[in-house]
Amino acid sequence: MQLVVNGSSMNIDSDELSITEFIKTLPIGDQPVLVELNGEAVLTREFDERTVRDGDKLEVIRMVAGG
């Protein structure tokens, strides 16, 4: 499937993934993230239920603590 992730095109060898499964394809390890799917913020507790499909647009933001 073809996605737009943080403004860049990305191909995934799957027809549909949960957001949790999609995040595991990214090189970010176990860092906590915020996700926007097609302009809508997705709650972390919904990551297993919400799906990513061909043509979707995602923004994935890593949360970093600092002082």
For the regions a protein language model found, what residue spans apply to each?
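Ubiquitin-like/PB1-type beta-grasp interaction modules and other compact soluble beta-rich domains
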Residues: 1-66
